[in-house]
C-alpha cells in the first residue's frame, strides 16, 4: 500500500516496486501539492485518489522513468544510445553543442514528463530575441528550427521507449522561416563580375585563390561550404572534374567538416577549361608559397587557405565578395547588385536554365535531392522560359492564320 508523508506544503507518496538484483527494495516516489482553492476535505480526497493512481501505475508497470528523469539526463542517454548509432560523428557533435548552448541551460533541469509546450515556446522566443555570443540581435528562425528538430527527436524517442506518454513538440510549431529573395547576376552582370575578378588578379588587388573560388562557385554551382572544403585531391586535371564529397559548416563559432546535406550532393562536376587552367597556375603558386613558408605551414591540402596554409574560414568569401562589388560600384555608374557567394550558385542555375539546359541536369549539377526542389527555387528563370514558350507558340499560330 502507498505510504503518504507530509513534507512542508506538499505530500510525498512512496510505493514499493519489488526488489532489485541485490534484494534491495525498490521505492518509487511522487510529490503531490494541495490546491489552495479547495477545502481540506476535497484536497484529502484528491490526495487519496492521486496516491491510489500512482500505486496502480507502479504496480501495473505503467509508471514511466520520465516522471523522475530530467531532460538533461535523458538527452545524454539519447545521444549515446540513439544519435551516435544513427548519425555521423560530426552531426552528433553539432547536436551536442546546440543542446549544451541553448537547451540544457533552459529546460535541462525539468523532469522529462514535465516539459510542456510553454517551456519550449519560451526557449525559442529567447533564442530569437538574444544571442549568446555577444553579437547583436537574436538567432535566425533557421537555427531555432534546427534546435526544435533536435528536441523533437529526443522527445519522440522518449515516447518510443515508453519513458513518457506524449511529446510536447507535437503541440507547438517552431518559428516560420521567412523566404528570402536571393540576389543573383544577370548574364551581363555575371560577365562584368568575372572580368572584374580577372582585372583585379592581374593588378594584384584580388588574390588568385579568391578569383578561382568565385569562378568555381559560379561555373559549378557550388555551395559555400562545399567550396571551402575542397582539397587538391578533389581536382582531377586529367578528366577536368571536381569531386564534391564534403562540406564545411560553422556552428556556435566552431568549424565542422561533414558530408554534404544529402546523397545527391555528393557528385562529380565538369569544370570549364579556363577555370581548370587557372587551377593549374594556382597549384604552382600554392606549392611555391608552401615551400616559402617552410615549418610555419599548417595546411592539409585545402585549395582555399589562410596565410599559414590552414583551411580558409567560411566567412572569408563573403567579405571578399562584398569588397570586390563595392570597389567596382564605386568606380562605375552601372552598378552590380550585392550578390553573395550563395547568389553565385543561384546565378549558375539561372544561366543554365536560360541556355535551355535540361531541367533534370540542373539539380544533378547543383546537388539538389529532387528536381522539384530546383523548380521551386529557380521559379523566376522557369517563368521567363515559360513566357518565351508562350511567345514562340503565339508567333507560330499567328503565322498559320
Regions found by a protein language model. Name each.
Residues 195, 199-201, 239, 252-275, ...:
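C-terminal secondary-structure termini that scaffold catalytic or DNA-interacting sites
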Residues 234-241, 357-379:
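Short, polar N-cap/turn motifs at the start of nucleic acid-interacting alpha helices
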Residues 137-141, 145-147, 160, 164-166, ...:
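Basic, Lys/Arg- and aromatic-enriched nucleic-acid-binding interface segment
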Residues 8-10, 17-122, 284-303, 310, ...:
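N-terminal DNA-binding module of tyrosine recombinases/phage integrases
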Residues 28-38, 241-243, 259-281, 298-322:
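C-terminal catalytic core of Y-nucleophile DNA break-rejoin enzymes
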Residues 133, 137, 195-210, 220, ...:
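Short, basic (Lys/Arg/His-rich) helix/loop patches that form interaction surfaces
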Residues 64, 184, 248-250, 366-392:
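Catalytic-site neighborhood detector that most strongly recognizes the C-terminal catalytic loop/helix
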Residues 98, 102, 110-122, 129-172, ...:
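N-terminal DNA-binding recognition helix of tyrosine site-specific recombinases/integrases
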